[in-house]
Amino acid sequence: MRLSIKTCTLDMPFAAMLDFCVAQGVQAVEIGTGNWSGAPHIDLDELLGSETARQRWMDQLRRRDIALCALNCSGNPLAFQKDWEVTEKTFRLAKLLGVEKIVMMSGLPAGCPGDKTPVWITTSWPPETQDILDYQWNEVAIPKWKELVRMAEDCGIRQIALENHGMQLVYNPETLFRLREAVGPLVGMNLDPSHLFWMGG
């Protein structure tokens, strides 16, 4: 197992960030590509559009013997088109870079057709919560996640690791297994204990 780090919190240029990682003994990096993760160390459009740019970017990693373990596009692809587009671009770039793991969040739909605000339901009462959940899962999440999984498979992605974060449709084992049963085992969990702490775990 390699010691790795999610780099988007490191406020420094790409090369300087990699040098810092080497100095700390970090052997692999998870690069944020946009949405909530930010993208301080990668330009999705540039790398998608230029093999030369991809080669130059990857050479920075190779020279330092740092592996690219995952791309992170955490956002809400179930509610916002711009987040869906970044997710789609991230999958396409993963194929071009040979990356097989994506870290992201499940997303959270609105509560009904025509609503624009994501609604996080964590209780079974009052009864209307079940109508909201039925809409979120069966009308939005499962169809869209089937599409995402097909897209991921077409791009050679073998694992989508969902953060167990609050204000997401998938945030605990029960909701993860519900999604896996619907879309298959390509979807798993990126276990972040810090999320459990603030959710009272």
Where are these regions (language model features)?
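Active-site acidic/histidine proton-transfer and metal-coordination neighborhood
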Residues: 16-19, 56-63, 77-191, 198
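Short polar catalytic/cofactor-binding loops
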Residues: 7-14
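The substrate-binding groove and active-site-proximal loops of carbohydrate-active enzymes
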Residues: 42-48, 72-81, 135
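Hydrophobic faces of well-ordered beta-strands that scaffold small-molecule active sites
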Residues: 3-7, 29-31, 68-73, 102-104, ...
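N-terminal amphipathic alpha-helix/helix-capping segment at the start of soluble metabolic enzymes
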Residues: 1-4, 61-62
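Bacterial c-di-GMP phosphodiesterase catalytic domain signature
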Residues: 201
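Catalytic domains of carbohydrate-active enzymes, especially glycoside hydrolases
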Residues: 14-37, 97-101
